[in-house]
């Protein structure tokens, strides 16, 4: 089957689309990436999404409108990846669309029950592309008592499980998440959870202090010095000591967090602040390994992926934090994979599993009561 996986993440840098060929289903699936592209959001669209993400500035009319606007954007992104690959759109079998997360409530707080909302109307995508769309992957896991995240572990089992090596797959998108993928000869369970901020705080600080969307290659952070009092403040965030399974998002590490941090530590230079929040991402990742993984698993390899793996300063900080450990550290590119395409490929794989009625959540990662088939199916016009 030819499937387009579509992902718009918490970093809001654009729409990632992977055109993938998949043979079979389940853990023996054969996956081939045909083409990958990122379609950037225009400034107006990015501003609308940011407005919708904030409780202070959002409203139901905006979210309702944005749902259809994003559906059209996702459809156009699918057309673009097919055009770039010289692949006829009519030959596309499925589209797996994650959507844009507007709010994610992994656990009940008072009368606010656990829930999640991703938008990007699948009916619009199906109509515009004349292709079946599978979307809303997180909701069934949450209906089964899970946190709806992380969902990439299933694809990571298929793509990265090694015959003899135990691996950690660390994704660094807007949020960081890790998957423990034991070797094929191991009887240990796959576990996965969010490790805290990935690029989210770094990007927000870049936008506010440098008027840049991100710190390319970590060049600015490299010019600064880590400030201990800021790092201590960040590392005292309660999320870091919550036991897995767990997930997080913009609600805990978004604009409100950065506003409080900048107000509290405004006396420090902007380069030092950026260096410190970059170290916060690295330290939160290392902390989670040392607290929740290394005591229970013998890890041979750590594989870094996502946009954050292109931040050389961040990667150096992670390497430094793990210098006493025996595991080797790689990036996706070191092993011939694409860091940028990883999550879009994952949702193509999940769409394939849903099409074949195969469960594809990992209850040991999400906390769900059982394995379930993920996603809703939207058919195109006849």
Swiss-Prot record:
Query: Which stretches are annotated as coiled coil?
Result: none
Task: Name the SUPFAM superfamilies for this protein.
Answer: Actin-like ATPase domain
Named from the GO MF annotations, one term is: ATP binding
| Uppermost EC category | transferase
User: Which reactions does this protein catalyse?
Assistant: 1,6-anhydro-N-acetyl-beta-muramate + ATP + H2O = N-acetyl-D-muramate 6-phosphate + ADP + H(+)
Q: In which pathway does it act?
A: Amino-sugar metabolism; 1,6-anhydro-N-acetylmuramate degradation; Cell wall biogenesis; peptidoglycan recycling
Q: Which residues bind ATP?
A: 9-16
User: Does the keyword section mention tRNA-binding?
Assistant: no
Quote the EC number: 2.7.1.170
* Main function: Catalyzes the specific phosphorylation of 1,6-anhydro-N-acetylmuramic acid (anhMurNAc) with the simultaneous cleavage of the 1,6-anhydro ring, generating MurNAc-6-P. Is required for the utilization of anhMurNAc either imported from the medium or derived from its own cell wall murein, and thus plays a role in cell wall recycling.
Q: What name does the UniProt record give this protein? A: Anhydro-N-acetylmuramic acid kinase
> Which organism was this protein described from?
Bacillus cereus (strain G9842)
Q: What is the lineage of its organism?
A: Bacteria, Bacillati, Bacillota, Bacilli, Bacillales
